[in-house]
């Protein structure tokens, strides 16, 4: 079973992740440029896109969280100030959004997208490192190998139809056992470092500027020795809808 898929390394180190060029649905605006690392039965994908130039989309066909890792990307929609995203900046594009997207030079972003048949949220939701953090639940004692952390989050976007949430999260250091991941999760680390443990004892070390995706059910542990902050996308998957 896949434990974690590395989508980007800030230091430019080569990736072992396999990407395939493919569109996400018949109306994908990035069909020629999309590289998919993971696609689940729950209509969620994660990967990367490289592009240059201008793209005008009358109605964005899905939900997509974008975090720029190289270059600069400008997102514009009616009724909102333009968002200019440089490396480490991100935003969520709601399904159905009329969007103008432009990049004057080659730009790359990592993404986590999901299909949505009954969208309720359109527009752009910026992701912010200096988020309005609020305390959130810590981890249960039976999965911790040490003191319980203090966790905070700021949820910037929610689409209830597909249980898709995106925002910013941070935590004090903690050590957690290897266990099945409770949801699909995209992470772009903003600060700190994490050692993700696999059942075979191997460890994947990730730091600020790195991005990865962990599928629901993948067995994985967490160990951090400093404050960690990240942009996240999470999605719960249910067997009743063919998602598990």
Model-derived features: positions:
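Ordered, small/hydrophobic-rich secondary-structure cores
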Residues: 1-91
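Conserved short histidine dyad/triad with adjacent acidic residue
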Residues: 29-35, 40-60, 152-182, 215-216
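Conserved hydrophobic/aromatic beta-strand scaffold that supports enzyme active sites
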Residues: 46-48, 65, 90-92, 166-168, ...
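Short, conserved beta-strand element in jelly-roll/cupin
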Residues: 60-74, 180-196
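Short acidic-glycine-tyrosine-enriched beta hairpin
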Residues: 79-96, 200-217
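Ligand-binding loop in jelly-roll beta-barrel domains
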Residues: 95-120, 216-240
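Surface-exposed beta-loop interaction hotspot
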Residues: 101-160
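A conserved acidic, glycine/proline-rich C-terminal tail/linker
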Residues: 177, 193-205
């Amino acid at each position: 079973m896949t434990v974690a898929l590395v989508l980007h390394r800030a230091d430019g180190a080569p990736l072992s992740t396999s990407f395939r060029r493919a569109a996400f649905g018949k109306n994908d605006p990035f069909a020629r440029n999309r590289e998919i690392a993971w696609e689940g039965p729950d209509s969620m994908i994660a990967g990367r896109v490289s592009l240059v130039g201008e793209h005008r989309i009358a109605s964005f066909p899905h939900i997509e969280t974008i975090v720029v890792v190289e270059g600069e990307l400008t997102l514009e929609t009616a009724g909102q100030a333009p968002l200019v995203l440089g490396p480490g900046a991100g935003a969520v594009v709601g399904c159905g959004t009329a969007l103008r997207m432009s990049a004057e030079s080659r730009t790359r972003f990592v993404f986590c997208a999901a299909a949505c048949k009954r969208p309720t949220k359109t527009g752009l939701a910026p992701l912010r490192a200096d988020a309005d953090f609020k305390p959130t639940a810590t981890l249960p004692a039976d999965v911790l190998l040490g003191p319980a952390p203090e966790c905070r989050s700021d949820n910037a976007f929610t689409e209830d139809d597909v249980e898709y949430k995106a925002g910013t999260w941070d935590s004090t250091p903690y050590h957690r056992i290897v266990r099945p991941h409770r949801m699909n999760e995209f992470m772009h680390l903003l600060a700190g470092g994490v050692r993700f443990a696999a059942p075979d004892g191997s460890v994947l070390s990730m730091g600020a500027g790195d991005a990865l995706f962990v599928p629901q059910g993948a067995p994985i542990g967490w160990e951090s020795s400093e404050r960690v902050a990240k942009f996240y996308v999470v999605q719960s998957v249910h067997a009743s809808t063919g998602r598990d």
